[in-house]
Swiss-Prot record:
Official protein name in the record: Chorismate synthase
Residue spans crossing the bilayer: none
InterPro entries registered for this protein in UniProt: Chorismate_synth (IPR000453), Chorismate_synth_AroC_sf (IPR035904), Chorismate_synthase_CS (IPR020541)
Function (record text): This reaction introduces a second double bond into the aromatic ring system.
Pathway: Metabolic intermediate biosynthesis; chorismate biosynthesis; chorismate from D-erythrose 4-phosphate and phosphoenolpyruvate: step 7/7
Family, as annotated: Belongs to the chorismate synthase family.
Keywords: Amino-acid biosynthesis, Aromatic amino acid biosynthesis, FAD, Flavoprotein, FMN, Lyase, NADP
One GO location term (cellular component): cytosol
A Pfam family that the UniProt record links to this protein: Chorismate_synt
PANTHER family: CHORISMATE SYNTHASE
Record's cofactor remark: Reduced FMN (FMNH(2)).
Annotated binding of NADP(+), by residue: 39, 45
């Protein structure tokens, strides 16, 4: 399975084409739109979320509610394009018109793609960079992930997410599965402890009042994964490596870990390796899950636990020093409308990116021309965990 997105932040629409989805999978557009709505929420979001009400239109690959096995095309309209039609349209405009609209950007923002992207593609107007490098593109990726979540649900695989940390304010590292699932989306910062939620809101407000931004840590959990998905044979087929690449490809994500992650460096091996147990009902399982459900680049049947680190958003209302690329003079960087904290929304994006990587790995592991074939093969693999 693979996908390709297109579109700019203030262009007319985002488009995504997904190839490799099995035939006969029931798809309801409202299920995808429900996930799109989640991405737009969260404390600390900017004013654009009041303008955009993201919904998906499926224009190919689905007929009468079921996938055909052919490429699926989805479109997300940018409602804000009405205010940008001339400056972001495909039709040529004069230099005078461009200057009068005052949308040309020559002062790159530190921490953004502006300057390096301008160098790479020889853009003297850095808007040509920031329009595509914007996190607006993640709306299309969430649409893909939502499609994948429908697929995973049909395979009895659950995936969900939460916020672990914002600006140094931390929730617990781990919760049991039932507590986790029972408290999803209980508040607007997506943490389970309400007291910690208020402390996070206060931290976000403090950053906003200072014209600053803050980052954090999110966690994604995948449950009921069949064993042996991925590979120990080749580096590029290791499941944890593929998930890691997907996570750090999300805008502003700078780190990823699994299970106890970097804390494993602080402990002896006897406290980190997960002992192997067996009973006739479950088959093989682990007495703990310090490694986050992954051994040797493969799923081991335990919940896969993914932690992603998001840096503070680089667009600041008290901008840092930069240099005008035309005059080479020092200036404060350009200010674009932005969030003060997007960590709650980023947890949704991360969840859907992981959903795609999991679905892709499953479709490579098992024959998957149609959903019934895939369901049977995964059932056989689950039985192998008992019979081996």
């Amino acid at each position: 399975m693979r996908y390709l997105t297109s579109g700019e932040s203030h262009g007319p629409q985002l488009t995504v084409i997904v190839e490799g989805v099995p035939a006969n999978l029931e798809i309801k557009v409202e299920d995808i739109n429900k996930e799109m709505f989640k991405r737009q929420g969260g404390y600390g979001r900017g004013r654009r979320m009041q303008i955009e009400k993201d919904t998906v239109e499926i224009v190919s690959g689905v007929r009468n509610g079921y996938t055909l096995g052919s490429p699926i095309t989805m479109v997300v309209t940018n409602d804000d394009f009405t205010h940008w039609r001339k400056i972001m349209g495909a039709a040529p405009i004069s230099d005078e018109e461009r200057e009068n609209m005052k949308r040309t950007i020559t002062k790159p923002r530190p921490g953004h793609a502006d300057l390096v992207g301008g160098m790479k593609y020889n853009h003297r107007d850095l808007r040509n960079v920031l329009e595509r490098s914007s996190a607006r593109e993640t709306a299309a990726r969430v649409a893909v992930g939502a499609l994948c979540k429908v697929l995973l649900e049909q395979l009895d695989i659950e995936i969900y997410s939460r916020v672990v940390e914002i600006g140094g304010i931390k929730d617990k590292d781990f919760y049991d599965s039932e507590t986790f699932k029972a408290n999803l989306d209980r508040n607007d910062v997506r943490v389970i402890d309400d007291g910690i939620a208020q402390a996070m809101r206060d931290k976000i407000d403090e950053a906003k009042n200072d014209g600053d931004s803050i980052g954090g840590v999110v966690q994604v959990v995948v449950e009921n994964m069949p064993v042996g998905v991925g590979s120990y044979v080749h580096y590029d087929r290791k499941l944890d490596g593929r998930i890691a690449q997907g996570v750090v490809s999300i805008n502003a994500f700078k780190g990823v870990s699994f299970g106890e992650g970097f804390k494993a460096a602080e402990k002896p091996g006897s406290e980190i390796q997960d002992e192997i147990l067996y009973n006739t009902e479950l088959g093989y399982y682990r007495g703990s899950n310090h490694l986050g459900g992954l051994e040797g680049g493969m799923s081991n049947g335990m919940p896969i636990i993914v932690n992603g680190v998001m840096k503070p958003i680089p667009t600041l209302y008290k901008p840092l020093n930069s240099v005008d690329i035309n005059t080479k003079e020092d200036f404060k960087a350009t200010i674009e409308r932005s969030d003060s904290c997007a960590v709650p929304a980023a947890s949704i994006v991360c969840e859907h990116v992981v959903a795609f990587e999991i679905a892709k790995a499953l479709l490579e592991e098992f024959q998957s021309n149609h959903i019934e074939q895939l369901q049977q093969q995964i059932a056989d693999r689950r039985q192998l965990n008992v019979e081996f």
